[in-house]
Amino acid sequence: MGKVRDILQIKGPGTFSVQPATTVYQALELMVEKNIGSLLVDDQGKFVGIFTERDYARKVILKGKTSKDTMIGEIMTENPVTVSPDDCMDHCMEVMTNRFIRHIPVVQNGDVNRVATAPSAPGANCVRWQANASRFC
């Protein structure tokens, strides 16, 4: 199976980030505009976390908070698990499966340069990633 970097090349460029002081509402607007399910959280150029659709569901909606009054810094996932572009896709899929996550930051030399994302359909990530990665083996 190929490397994380191989799959990210197929996916194309692009990551988006917000600051901890951004409201959840503003972050959701950006996610809808860009049709993405997660945002990196950046504090003065330093990667400090990730905000995902699940964070919104579990930490805002189910807690009775409002998206316009809640800041990303209050609910983001701090110190999320990450992978390297040089990691094998098998490792990436295993981490995502074992941790029940769909978005995982890809970190190289301390910098986050991408987010690897699993499709929402159960099992589709393995099939799609294996099909694409086999081209690089």
Residue ranges and their predicted role:
Residues 1, 28-29, 43-45, 63-65, ...:
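Short hydrophobic/aromatic-rich motifs at helix boundaries and adjacent loops
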Residues 15-16, 38-39, 48, 73-74, ...:
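Structural motif
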Residues 31-34, 39-55, 96, 104-120:
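A glycine-centered beta-loop-beta connector
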